[in-house]
């Protein structure tokens, strides 16, 4: 029975891995955007983390996840004689597939090893596989998803080293050193998860000190070695012209830059400040749902310590949550590594009520976060070259025999930032697409930008030079007054929006306005009018 359940959950995980929801801009801009632009020369815009004077993001742990698959695809297309590099949609789904495979193999394997009792392992693996976090966050290209795997395998190796008392565990210590370096360079939050469980290694190292402390030498030596490689990789990435002496004399150590940046509360204020209880009272319940409620209820028996608290997984997750709660910027994805750890401590209740609530919770959040959350941004950006080519006006400066150039400006409004790399390559330069991200500016500001850019149309029926497009959620009621309706003969404004393309599976949660509109009207607008559309902006009377 458990095998059939696990296989069904595996199919569900594949479905969500290939669904184009968009959970946070970091999943594109701190990974695929960087390497797609570097390897394939796709249009890209590096985020500030990579362009600051003291960059805070390392490419060392990202290289095997993004650079290697993209480079292999580039090589494969070149070997098969393809005239162009791999299209962005292929890159997009291959990277999603890589994240799925990493989670399927490494996360499930680690969970299976971390549970000490064989009779609980199958149920625990199924429980973790049934979490919407596994379906969605863990299959997206987040550094947090990679951190989950590194934390889990860090705990696995610590357990192997501690349990194996008769051997020096040189190889396990070397691998643990690599995981520690990769984890720190991936996210500076990584040590919070392994700091306390790692104390179990001290007696092991001390016990081996009777003879030469081979395990300790292995861990420290390989740690220094991998640290040096990581620093050299980052220095070469950010300063390509630097010599080896330059890298040794003035290295770029991104974790230190990251720590210094996040230690300044004024920097964190730019990203949003939260109360210190946000992780425990909001984020963990959002990630774990009824399982977290059952864990909280079990604490009422104190001072008797619940069984699920008496293991390194729970200590790792809860101690990390306490440490991360010190910092005032708190997002749910920071706690993604806690999900498999805490669920592996939880004994599945045989109550039908709990199982029903668990399934409803994960199904609802799975569809919301895995399909609808900003779900139209990626399909719209992938379709944008085709939309523009089919609808734009050719520029007037093309000479006879030349490929005419189509220029367009695309305004994105009330969406997450569109990944530029999804526009792909354009070797014939027939398309010139300028993307302007207006984020959530007031509606009148959008119209003002359109009025500035749209050329005058003095003669009715004349064609306007260039093209202007607007991408926005269909729930943005402000645009209704400008939307062109063929059934209406009257022109309500001097500016018209002609809908060219739409994608139904898109919900913009940032557009919720319960305070002004009320709960029901807001939900009716945001959910009832779900979808993302592409409009072409024109002045009234222009063709």
Curated annotation (Swiss-Prot):
State the name under which the record lists this protein. Answer: GPI mannosyltransferase 4
Q: Which GO terms describe its biological process?
A: GPI anchor biosynthetic process
What's an example of a GO molecular-function annotation for this chain? alpha-1,2-mannosyltransferase activity
How does the record classify its membrane topology? Multi-pass membrane protein
Q: Which GO terms describe its cellular component?
A: endoplasmic reticulum membrane
Q: Which InterPro entries match?
A: GPI_mannosylTrfase
Pfam families in the record, alphabetically?
A: Glyco_transf_22
* Spans traversing the lipid bilayer: 5-25, 98-118, 176-196, 213-233, 353-373
Cellular compartment(s): Endoplasmic reticulum membrane
Superkingdom assignment:
Eukaryota
Keyword field contains Glycoprotein: yes
In the Enzyme Commission scheme, what number(s) does this protein have?
2.4.1.-
Q: What does this protein do?
A: Alpha-1,2-mannosyltransferase involved in glycosylphosphatidylinositol-anchor biosynthesis. Transfers a fourth mannose to trimannosyl-GPIs during GPI precursor assembly. The presence of a fourth mannose in GPI is essential in fungi.
Q: Which UniProt keywords apply?
A: Endoplasmic reticulum, Glycoprotein, Glycosyltransferase, GPI-anchor biosynthesis, Membrane, Transferase, Transmembrane, Transmembrane helix
- What family does the Swiss-Prot or TrEMBL record give for this protein? Belongs to the glycosyltransferase 22 family. PIGZ subfamily.
């Amino acid at each position: 029975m458990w095998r059939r359940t696990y296989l069904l959950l595996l199919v569900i995980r594949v479905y969500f891995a290939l669904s184009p929801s968009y959970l946070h801009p970091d999943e594109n801009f701190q990974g695929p955007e960087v390497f797609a632009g570097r390897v394939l020369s796709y249009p890209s815009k590096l985020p500030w983390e990579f362009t600051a004077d003291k960059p805070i993001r390392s490419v060392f742990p990202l290289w095997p996840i993004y650079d290697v698959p993209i480079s292999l695809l580039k090589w494969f297309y070149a070997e098969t004689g393809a005239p162009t590099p791999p299209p962005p949609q292929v890159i997009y789904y291959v990277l999603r597939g890589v994240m799925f495979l990493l989670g399927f193999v490494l996360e499930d394997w680690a969970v299976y090893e971390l549970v000490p009792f064989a009779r609980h392992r199958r149920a625990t693996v199924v429980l973790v596989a049934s979490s919407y976090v596994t379906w969605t966050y863990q299959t997206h290209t987040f550094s947090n998803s990679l951190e989950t795997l590194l934390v889990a395998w860090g705990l696995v190796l610590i357990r192997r080293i501690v349990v194996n008392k008769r051997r020096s565990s040189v190889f396990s210590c070397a691998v643990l050193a690599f995981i520690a370096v990769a984890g720190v360079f991936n996210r500076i939050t990584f040590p919070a998860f392994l700091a306390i469980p790692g104390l179990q290694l001290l007696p092991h190292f001390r016990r081996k000190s009777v003879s030469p402390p081979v395990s300790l030498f292995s861990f420290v030596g390989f740690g220094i070695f991998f640290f040096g490689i990581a620093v050299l990789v980052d220095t070469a990435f950010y300063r390509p012209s630097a010599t080896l002496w330059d890298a040794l004399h003035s290295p770029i150590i991104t974790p230190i830059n990251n720590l210094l940046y996040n230690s300044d509360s004024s920097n964190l204020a730019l990203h949003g400040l939260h109360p210190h209880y946000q992780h425990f009272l909001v984020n963990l319940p959002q990630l774990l749902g009824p399982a977290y409620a059952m864990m909280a209820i079990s604490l009422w028996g104190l001072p008797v310590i619940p069984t699920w608290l008496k293991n390194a997984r729970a200590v790792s997750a809860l101690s990390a949550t306490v440490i991360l709660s010190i910092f005032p910027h708190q997002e749910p994805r920071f706690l993604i590594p806690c999900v498999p750890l805490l669920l592996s401590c939880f004994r599945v209740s045989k109550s039908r009520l709990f199982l029903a609530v668990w399934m409803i919770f994960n199904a609802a959040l799975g569809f919301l976060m895995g399909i609808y959350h900003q779900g139209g941004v990626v399909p719209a950006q992938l379709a944008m070259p085709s939309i523009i080519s089919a609808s734009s006006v050719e520029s007037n400066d093309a000479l006879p025999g030349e490929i005419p150039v189509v220029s367009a400006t695309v305004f994105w409004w009330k969406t997450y930032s569109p990944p530029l790399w999804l526009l792909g390559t354009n070797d014939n330069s027939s398309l010139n697409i300028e993307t302007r991200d207006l984020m959530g500016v007031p509606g009148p500001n959008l119209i003002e930008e359109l009025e500035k850019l749209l050329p005058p149309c003095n003669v009715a029926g004349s064609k306007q030079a260039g093209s202007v497009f607007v991408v926005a959620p269909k729930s943005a009621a402000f645009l209704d007054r400008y939307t062109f309706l063929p059934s209406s003969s009257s022109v309500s404004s001097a500016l018209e929006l002609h809908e060219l393309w739409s994608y139904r599976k898109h919900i913009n949660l940032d557009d919720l306005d319960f305070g002004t509109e009320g709960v029901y009207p807001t939900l009716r607008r945001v959910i009832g009018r779900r979808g993302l559309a592409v409009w072409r902006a024109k002045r009234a009377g222009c063709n």
